[in-house]
């Protein structure tokens, strides 16, 4: 199979600070805009060796190109990233209860920019294996992944899960997972922003889920979780990136149901995210979010909507800049014109609400980066039967 994606666009924005000249240390009036191009291509081949063994090989290449311009200035800044990837995944069904997943993956990132970076390429190699067991009384998962990063060395991460059915309609799932994330090139080296002394993030997560089939058309899923992050990469203030110790406690609930032949989903999330040293709330994470989705199909046509609420949050690590909560409403429609062609229409933020999810400071005052107001999005999906 083949997957191809290409997306291009242009963005204009306001810059109250003006264009800063590093040679003269003077700011000039500016009318900046960006042009971007995001593309990816991947090919895969899958082999059913026998009834028990399936093997899949995938190769990919992706590009994220961005150029910054100024209508009042002739120069430009380029920031282009490239990634080559390869993955080999093997699935062995030993019997109806035991399954083993094993594989390797490789990525190589490259950076081309008008800015000077200390490093402009690195690779990551990984090997992983996971065993799954599904029995009548319980089920288990146990996995191990070994990463070798050219810049940040080697790291082992584990994951495990235990599922316990209770009666015919309920199931408890207890899980544990470890994470590893290397800083990006921007985090490390971007001029006047990056911190070359950053460490890689490491995390441990614990979660307890309850899945209940309350009725034929009503399903409830709830979970409580805790994530502890060592050396989380966090923006502090004044272009300062640091590693901090963080802790996130959360509760999530999802009620999926059918009403008048329409599919509905009510989702609630409660999050308490803290810097473990200062006790402050982590930046730009709302404590409470609530959303409701409703979709109905009429033959080849579909309609739906999403209502979303988010509570206040803080923009900075010291919790001095408060971001107000907000609510939005989206509606959507779809039409499967032919077996191969589908058309989608989305009206986002139909009540044209003004809101922000991040802020900046200028002349001692705080201002919000404005999110999109009323937006119309039209898309087409072509899926040829080759």
Where are these regions (language model features)?
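C-terminal beta-signal and terminal closure region of outer-membrane beta-barrel proteins
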Residues: 248-249, 354-386
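Transmembrane beta-barrel strands of outer-membrane/channel proteins
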Residues: 2-6, 57-61, 86, 102-108, ...
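Hydrophobic, lipid-facing positions within transmembrane beta-strands of outer-membrane proteins
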Residues: 39-43, 84-88, 125-129, 140, ...
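Surface-exposed extracellular loop regions of Gram-negative outer-membrane beta-barrel proteins
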Residues: 53-63, 67-69, 99-107, 114, ...
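Residue-level signature of outer-membrane beta-barrel architecture
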Residues: 45-51, 92-94, 131-135, 146, ...
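Gram-negative outer-membrane beta-barrel transporters
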Residues: 96-100, 134-139, 220, 224-228, ...
